Regions:
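Surface segments flanking catalytic/ligand-binding clefts of nucleic-acid enzymes
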Residues: 1-122
Length: 122
């Protein structure tokens, strides 16, 4: 049991951890989604098509075949960009739609949530 200054905040922070996020921004995105009232996606969702692995996406709504990916700065590197596009093509061929989120989107959460709500409704 943690006690002392800051222990209450530390316990609250630990309660929010899920162990699946691969970056602080993914955690911020998951917490935003949790407060939004939108259906919660599966974190680190494995996408299969005809029984074969296609990709693992940051967040996925399988029933809507919608993936949500957080794109940090490193996704703009030439080699990573090409790999990301190959992966995007595989997801689309499997019938999935992909929405991307950047740091700029997280600074405008209302717009991001409106965009996601529309994608979930489509």
């Amino acid at each position: 049991e943690m006690t002392g200054p800051g222990s209450r905040r530390a316990r609250a922070a630990c309660a929010l951890a899920d162990g699946l996020a691969e970056s602080p921004q993914e955690t911020r995105l998951r917490l935003l989604l949790g407060r939004s009232g939108l259906p919660m996606p599966i974190a680190q969702c494995r996408v299969l098509h005809e029984g074969r692995f296609v990709a693992r996406v940051d967040f996925g709504w399988r029933d809507r075949r919608l993936a949500l990916e957080y794109d940090g700065l490193w996704h703009g590197e030439p080699g990573q960009f090409a790999r990301d596009r190959e992966r995007l093509n595989r997801l689309r061929e499997a019938g999935w739609r992909v929405a991307f989120v950047t740091a700029a989107d997280l600074r405008r959460p209302e717009l991001l949530l409106c965009r996601l709500a529309a994608a979930l409704a489509a």
